[in-house]
From Swiss-Prot:
The gene is rpsP. Keywords: Ribonucleoprotein, Ribosomal protein. This is Small ribosomal subunit protein bS16. Belongs to the bacterial ribosomal protein bS16 family. Gene3D superfamilies: 3.30.1320.10. InterPro entries: Ribosomal_bS16 (IPR000307), Ribosomal_bS16_CS (IPR020592), Ribosomal_bS16_dom_sf (IPR023803).
């Protein structure tokens, strides 16, 4: 089972709100997911990002692939850097 970390769209029309979820890559964008690890609100100024860092690092360590947008969110939060450092054993 290929697992991805991606955004699940919520909110009303023209006011998107996203949940950062871990899901099977074959399931639909807003369909079944394994675990919710955070939220992302692009409408707020500045954009609000809340991510459970421990859960994100756990899933990255287990081989989950983040989508491009989620990878950018993780990089801005410093999660990707921590993941790469832990991979190198530092």
């Amino acid at each position: 089972m290929a697992v991805k970390i991606r955004l699940k769209r919520m909110g009303a029309k023209k006011t998107p709100f996203y949940r950062v979820v871990v899901a099977d890559s074959r399931s639909p964008r807003d369909g079944r997911f394994i675990e919710e690890i955070g939220t992302y609100n692009p409408v707020a100024q500045p954009a609000e990002v809340k991510i459970n860092e421990e859960a994100a690092l756990k899933w990255l360590g287990n081989g989950a692939k983040p989508s491009d947008t989620v990878r950018n969110l993780f990089s801005n939060q410093g999660i990707m850097e921590k993941f790469h450092l832990s991979k190198q054993g530092k």
